[in-house]
Each structure stands twice: as C-alpha cells, then as structure tokens.
Amino acid sequence: MSHKSAEMYELKKKVEELKKIRGRATELVSLYIPADYDLNKVMQQLREEYGTAQNIKSKTTRKNVLGALERAMQHLKLYRQTPETGLALFVGNVSEQEGVSDIRVFAIVPPEPLNVRLYRCDQTFVTEPLEEMLRVKDAYGLITVEKNEATIGILRGKKIEVIEDLTSNVPGKTRAGGQSARRYERIREQEAHEFMKRIGEHASSVFLPLLEKDELKGIIIGGPGPTKEEFVEGEYLHHELRKRILGVVDISYHGEYGLRELVEKASDILREHEAVKERKLVQQFFKHLVKDTGLITYGEKEVRKALELGAVDILLLSEGYDRVRVKALCNNCGWEELKTMTEAEFELYKKNLKACPKCNSQNISVEKWDVAEELIKIAEEGGAEVEIISLDTEEGQQFYKAFGGIAAILRYKLQ
C-alpha cells in the first residue's frame, strides 16, 4: 500500500471517531484552512468569534465555546504557516458527563489539498469535506450481454455495484422452414437489434455522467457467446464510451455473479486495480495457511511480535478492525496495565476502573490509541508493506470474520 493509501485509511478512522462525538449544545468548533491561506487572518476571525461567544446566554455553553476557541488559537500558534495540503481543526468538549469539561483538539493535515475555508460552531463536527476525499472516485463500467438479458454495473474501489438488470423479448430459434422461417428470423433480428439499442441507451445514462466527472476509467464487456462482440461491433454504445472499452471477455454467468466473474476474468486488464490485488493477497494468505508453510501469522499479539522482530513482509489489516490499545497507570504507586480491546469494551473498562487494584488509590490516568495506526507505523519503519483489506469482497469478509481482520505474511519462519 502506498503512503497515501495509509494516510487515507488513517483519515477514515479519524473521521469515524469525529462523527461519533455529540455536543450538548452548539459548542463544537470545526475549522477548515486551505493550503497557503494566511494563518493571521484565521487567528483574527477566531478572536472575533471569541468576542461574539461571550454573549451566549447559557453559562455552560458559553464556557465550552470559549474554551474551544482558546484551544484552537493555542494550537494554531504551533504552525509557522499552513501545512502544504491545508489544515482541519476540530475542537470541543467531548465529555459525556454533564458539568464536566474535557476540551480536546483534533488536528488533521489531509492527504489531499483542502479547497474549502470554513468555520462552524455546531452540535456536531463538520466532516463532509474530509468524507469527500475518502470517496473512491475512479470507476470502471461493467456490462454483461446475452441474447435475452444484460446487466450493467460499476466497479468502484473494491465494490461491485449492480446498477440494472435488463431482459428482452427476443424469441428463440424456430424449426419452421420457407418464408415463415425467414420472416420469423427477421423479427428475431429486429428484436435483438432493439434490445442492443436499449442496453446502449441504459449504459449511456449510467456511464456518461461518470465520464463528464472524469471518474470513468474504462469499460469491460463480457458474455457467454458472440452477442457481446455483436454489441461492440454494432456500435450500440455512445461513441465517447466506445473509446473507453478496455476489453471484451468470455464469461459463463449473468447478473451479479456475471459481474464478479467479469472482474475476475479481466484481471489482466485490471492488474493494478485494488479489487484484483486484494483478492490475490487474501488468496496468498489462505494458500500459506492450507499448506502450513509457517510464513503467516494472525492475531494482534502474534502480528505485533512479528513486526517487532522485523519478520513481516506484508501486514494485512481489515478496514473493519477497530481495536484500541489501553494503558492504565496509577499515579500513586506506579501500577500499570496494558490491554487491547474494542471501543465498546474501553468505555466499560473506564467505568469499572474506580481504584488501583494494588494501593486502592483513585488517582489513575487512562490513555488509549488506535492499534491499526500503531501497527502501520511499526510496519512502515520496518520496511514492511501494508495492505488494507476491505469488507466489500467475499474474501475480505472471510478474512475479517475468520481471522479477526489482522494477519501478516512473513519474510521467514519464526521459531
């Protein structure tokens, strides 16, 4: 996975975290600063907002908004200039206990340049500009064609989406002879022609808007017989879409299974595409597992150990993996505990950890961090590749459910 892909994965995790936060009132500050924008102007705006916020009637809301603006201005002083791709700041009281203030700053330097300048104080953080960066824009058009049916779909990222199933009234062949047979054949050819036209029209309505947005990277057409070639050679597709045909492939199925087979059979065409690459990686992992080569490991503890030994060639992480690393420390006696758990388990852990089990002191600090981000950093420092496995494919689902969404392909066997 490229450095940018790793950044996108981490951005997705941060956006998910931000979207879960809710303010008790209009008190969460979102600030988007485009690349090269003058930070002095931003500071001036925040000072003006600070003055306005002093008029908020609710004492609690006023305190939280003023606190958020103060923290935002303090954080901006850390930057001599706006980062190369811009800066997104999210500041506010994240405490779920009424009357308790826990104002936190979430600073994100995005992997792509920000083109929006925004300040908003609301009950939720504004994440839409970052979510737009996460949207997979590159798309491939998929068409399966038979005499009596066709399916139009889109491959975007690793997800295959069925857009439309079409059926025709093309009659089957007849055994009648003479003029009846010729007349019947003409009717059959006309029906087939009309059906092909309809496929082309529906494909245009789906793919031309993608082409206009420069998102359509190509079209792949498949089918079990000669109909697919007739469709291509008959120029039923819009002329701009015909230029985007990457290949015509023989397949056995139709419908959703046909689209999956089309992507599989067109792997040479889509060699660099994520769906094909991901499928091959997971299959490689399963192959090592079945053959018991000793060149794989899975589970957070085992993968962490392999990473620390520098034995990992490829780190495989499911996008559904949501574990956090938690460290509890008694500031009185030094007792310490380190655990890995889910976000839901963390909330319960905090609630139940009322006193130190060693000295009974209540002076305990608890910190947490994202396991996936931590392991990605260790992997990159050790020269290992990192691959994020989506949940959009059967292989991705199987990897997540059967192996917990974390595994590694190793450079050498571990003792």
Swiss-Prot record:
Keyword match Protein biosynthesis:
yes
List the coiled-coil residues. Answer: none
Classification via Pfam families: eRF1_1, eRF1_2, eRF1_3
Q: Single GO molecular-function term?
A: translation release factor activity, codon specific
- Determine the domain of life of the protein's source: Archaea
Where does this protein reside within or beyond the cell? Answer: Cytoplasm
Keywords noted in UniProt: Cytoplasm, Protein biosynthesis
The entry's cellular-component GO terms read: cytoplasm
Presence of the UniProt keyword Zinc in the record: no
Grouped into one coarse class, the protein's main location is cytoplasm
Q: Which InterPro entries match?
A: eFR1_2_sf, eRF1_1_Pelota, eRF1_1_sf, eRF1_2, eRF1_3, Peptide_chain-rel_aRF1, Peptide_chain-rel_eRF1/aRF1, Ribosomal_eL30-like_sf
Q: What does this protein do?
A: Directs the termination of nascent peptide synthesis (translation) in response to the termination codons UAA, UAG and UGA.
Q: Which family does it belong to?
A: Belongs to the eukaryotic release factor 1 family.
Assembly information from the UniProt record: Heterodimer of two subunits, one of which binds GTP.
Q: What protein name does the entry list?
A: Peptide chain release factor subunit 1
Query: Which organism's genome codes for this protein?
Result: Thermococcus sibiricus (strain DSM 12597 / MM 739)
- Gene designation: prf1
